[in-house]
Amino acid sequence: MITVVFCFSDCHGGIQILGRMSSVNKIKLNENNKMHSFGNWERCRNLGEGGFGLVIHWRNRTTGREIATKHIKEMGALSADQQVKLSERWNKELNWSRQFKNFPHIVAGVDIEDPDFLEYLNGMFSAKLPVIVLEYCNGGDVRKRLQSPENANGLTEFEVRQILGALRKALHFLHSQCGICHRDLKPDNIVIQRGVDGKKIYKLTDFGLARGTPDQTMVQSVVGTRHYYAPEVVENGFYNSTVDLWSFGVIAYELVTGELPFIPHQTLKNIILNLIKKPAKCIAITEDPEDNTRFVNQFELPQTHHLSRPWAAQFTKWLASPLNSNYKERGQLAANNVPVVFADLDKILNMNVLTIFAVNNCERLEYAVSAEMTMKDLIALIVLDTGMDEKELYFVLPTSHPHKTITPKSTPLQLYVEEWSDTSKDSRKWTKRSNPPVMLYIFQVKKECDYKIPEPILSILSRKFIANKFKTKERWLQKRVVLDMLYVLTKEQARYEMLVSGINERALSLEDEMMENSFIDSIDKQRIIISFAYDQLTSLLKEAQAKIPSRQLISSAQWEKLNRNYNFIIQSAKSIRSFLEACLREAKDMVKTTNQLRKEVCEKDLFDCARFYKKYLCNGAIISPSELNNDAEEFAKSRFKLYNEGEARHLPKSIDHMHYLYFKTKESIPVLLQQFCDIKKEIFQINLQMLMSASSTPPPKLELSAAMDRLAISSGSPSSDPFDSLRTINAIEEAERINNILVNEMKIDHY
């Protein structure tokens, strides 16, 4: 069997070498590694190397185009029969690569419009098999993604979905359109093409072991990497394209958990024996750490994953289908002639999961949302899960949310933002975009808010390890307890980041609300109008009484009541206005403080995860029960200090207090505006009363001064000049003018 790896990647520059090589081959390898070019084509580096094959990365200096070329170096060490088989397989792969040109999820062959360069490529080695020219994928492979520190316990749900969706399409295309069974599916053979926007496209590659798949089963040699091939391959050698479905299931489990599902550290014999007899719904097999002769069938995912609860539940049900040991059941077709494995996967890939962070409970919530779901349905679920009163719930959308604001007509599906499911550090780095950790924040709004911080829980395995319950300290057990502890550390880091982000978003939301709501402008406008009308009425009444002392236009009690009401409402308006201004200043200060806190927290390794990962997973240090216990205690101390002495303790309460007072002040504004309306009516009635009294009085022979003619009123900045004379007809006109202003102003909308 000849294995050539071509995971075309700029990441992790090491060369992967498979197969045994003689000293002669090693010398040739060193010679071939010398970087040289041909024309405009620069040879960048070797991507993959085997005993017979080589994959090279090239870049065109003029156009910037990048390609990968796959070669057979020499076949002299093979028998004539082996050379024929290799040639047949090679030419099939060459032809297949040309079939993939228009399919986005398979690495395709490409054309080179440079016959001299193509001739050079074909003449590089003694083997006369034609070069295979392929598109170059610049983002590494999925194996490298699984090996990154943030993915030690599996990938994020977003990336899992993206990879499974791409692999499902690639396999269905190969099986149904090309009649090809890949036979060597594994994370190493799923490569990544990263676009200029940083987004990733996943592509299946390496068809060195692929063969045509007739409808009937066929006897084949055992190929593929042992942890990914189906039990029937080893059991009897009879298999068909359903072996790819099994490998698909193994990859799916590994993507989610970071581990292989079926006792990978055990002997091949133990693995196969347990696979053959496992129940249909079993999705993993583990070794009992207290009895290494006992193996346990698992029907649920381990808790150390990064999936949302609703999606994890559906994923677990689906996973039993591709991991069914019975290949006939595994390959069942749905009504549309698509394998049930693919049809059921399509359903869960279409699930929309709304992510929420309940700040008062310091808890992440996740709900599957659909077009039929209402906000009432969502609120009922939140109340059930948090124990908060529905009337006390306050929703805050992240600043950049496309829905902008929640209205009575909003639906939960409108709050879902698909791209925000991608919260990985890798995406943040390449897309230059930092998605919020959730799609919605919820808070409790009342005078004294309740706060609860859930306690992190060490796995049972870790607790038993610390208590020295295990006689054996095998490497797999060491690694598992380290991964369990790392999961606790990373989850707590993520929880604290969500808490701080929520506090920051609430401060931003309050500031925006205060700036957008024109309460101060409304109060100022009404205060100016009322003050003007009151001053006009006072001047008019004073002059009228001076000119007609014998006639009392209004009673003293009526005037005192008006004066008392006027002074009260003006003072109330000033107080409310002053408080609103103070709230806005405080909100701006809170925004500055929480912006800085959020930046610091997101850039800091709060619980020293990197050191822990490097020491025990990169450098392979052996962890003892006492060391694990010490790490757990240090984590507990750091966590206690953060939640009880850090800014995240007092900031929420300060914002709570400000929000509650602002909320109560908002409730008083409609009352204030109604009081403005009421006093307008009072002034209107007094003006009307004066008008009627003046109309019944014989007009005195007095002339209005020029100041009366200059009286001007506007809704923007009303003004008037005092007058020193009064005639009945002018008194009526003046009263009517004031009345008209008040009538018009009483028609304004109130909050």
From Swiss-Prot:
Residue(s) carrying Phosphothreonine: T225
Gene label: IKKbeta
Residues reported in the UniProt entry to bind ATP: L47, G48, E49, G50, G51, F52, G53, L54, V55, K70
Catalytic activity: L-seryl-[I-kappa-B protein] + ATP = O-phospho-L-seryl-[I-kappa-B protein] + ADP + H(+)
Locations listed in the record: Cytoplasm
Post-translational modifications reported in the UniProt record: Autophosphorylated; upon LPS stimulation it is transiently activated, and can be autophosphorylated.
InterPro entries: IKK, Kinase-like_dom_sf, Prot_kinase_dom, Ser/Thr_kinase_AS
Oligomeric and partner information: Interacts with key to form the I-kappa-B kinase complex. In vitro, interacts with cact.
Function comment: Required for the activation of the NF-kappa-B factor Relish (Rel) by acting as an essential signaling component in transmitting the lipopolysaccharide (LPS) signal leading to cact degradation, which is required for direct activation of Rel. Phosphorylates inhibitors of NF-kappa-B (cact) thus leading to the dissociation of the inhibitor/NF-kappa-B complex and ultimately the degradation of the NF-kappa-B inhibitor. Essential for antibacterial immune response. Also required for antiviral immune response.
Active site (UniProt): D184
Keyword check for Glycosyltransferase: no
Modification type Phosphotyrosine: residues: Y202
Phosphoserine PTM positions: S221
Spans annotated as Leucine-zipper: 489-510
UniProt source species: Drosophila melanogaster
Domain of life of the organism encoding this protein: Eukaryota
Family affiliation: Belongs to the protein kinase superfamily. Ser/Thr protein kinase family. I-kappa-B kinase subfamily.
Name of protein: Inhibitor of nuclear factor kappa-B kinase subunit beta
Its EC number(s): 2.7.11.10
Pfam families: Pkinase (PF00069)
BP GO terms, sorted: antibacterial humoral response; cellular response to hypoxia; cGAS/STING signaling pathway; defense response to virus; innate immune response; peptidoglycan recognition protein signaling pathway; positive regulation of antibacterial peptide biosynthetic process; positive regulation of canonical NF-kappaB signal transduction
Gene Ontology molecular-function annotations: ATP binding; identical protein binding; IkappaB kinase activity; protein serine/threonine kinase activity
Known outcome of mutating K70A: Loss of kinase activity
